[in-house]
């Protein structure tokens, strides 16, 4: 059976590895085919058309084919639209990529998550410090929901009891959403959790999730970080450790 060729596929490079003196292995997030591994033959040659294009956090359209685990990249076209993020925004973009590399299975399509990623990268490229943390929280929520690791945020996980709007609740990796205890430093009101659930529901836009994070971004950051580290199986993500090391200089 002939191998399938995919053309004009929206994609972002998540990571790239040296494969030979002249070629690269790419880990690519595509809209309709999920996370795929591609070999870009000759991409390291000075004359290669791939050389200036295969960069992280840049929107591409790619064509690839083959029936092996690592398929052949046939073409790649930069779609433009924004500049490369820099500074904290660049490190935040690498953080998003590390999350996708750790949590997404290969060849598992998530078109809505891809759209959320693209929207987040555009916000990072805008270099607006006021939206950076909001964009990260909104994407983390969309990622966890998209891969089935986020419980419903309008009910206690253990009992399915609807949240009381004025009661405080916390999201715990092992137990889901529960009532906050006196020693829980970070918690959200039931109304805030319900607003997040509503923003994540149905066919809502990424901007809805972004807006719902405005009132609770700091408290949400601590809880989502613990949940993500738990599911990634690490104490600290590499990109987060890099951020902490740079801040300590």
UniProtKB/Swiss-Prot annotation:
The keyword Transit peptide does not apply. Gene3D superfamilies: Nucleic acid-binding proteins, Recombination protein O, C-terminal domain. Keywords: DNA damage, DNA recombination, DNA repair. One of its GO terms (cellular component) is bacterial nucleoid. One of its GO terms (biological process) is double-strand break repair. It holds the Pfam family RecO_N. The keyword DNA damage applies. HAMAP family: RecO (MF_00201). NCBIfam families: reco. Belongs to the RecO family. Involved in DNA repair and RecF pathway recombination. This is DNA repair protein RecO. It comes from Polaromonas naphthalenivorans (strain CJ2). The lineage of its organism: Bacteria, Pseudomonadati, Pseudomonadota, Betaproteobacteria, Burkholderiales.
């Amino acid at each position: 059976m002939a191998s399938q060729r995919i053309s004009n596929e929206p994609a972002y490079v998540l990571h790239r590895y040296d494969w030979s003196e002249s070629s690269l292995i790419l880990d690519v997030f595509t809209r309709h085919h999920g996370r795929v591994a591609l070999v870009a033959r000759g991409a390291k040659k000075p004359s290669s058309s791939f050389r200036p294009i295969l960069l992280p956090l840049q929107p591409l359209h790619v064509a690839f084919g083959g029936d092996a685990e690592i398929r052949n990249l046939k073409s790649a076209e930069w779609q433009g639209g924004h500049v490369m993020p820099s500074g904290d925004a660049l490190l935040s973009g690498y953080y998003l990529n590390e999350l996708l590399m750790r949590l997404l299975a290969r060849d598992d399509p998530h078109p809505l998550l891809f759209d959320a990623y693209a929207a987040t990268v555009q916000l990072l490229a805008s270099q607006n410090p006021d939206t950076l943390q909001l964009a990260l929280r909104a994407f983390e929520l969309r990622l966890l929901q998209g891969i089935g690791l986020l419980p419903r945020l309008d009910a206690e996980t253990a009992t399915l009891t609807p949240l009381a709007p004025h009661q405080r609740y916390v999201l715990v990796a092992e137990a889901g959403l529960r009532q906050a205890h006196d020693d829980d430093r970070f918690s959200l009101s039931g109304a805030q959790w319900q607003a997040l659930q509503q923003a994540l529901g149905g066919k809502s836009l990424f901007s809805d999730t972004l807006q719902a994070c405005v009132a609770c971004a700091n408290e949400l950051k601590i809880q989502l970080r613990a949940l993500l580290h738990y599911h990634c199986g690490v104490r600290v993500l590499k990109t987060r450790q890099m951020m902490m090391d740079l801040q300590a200089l």
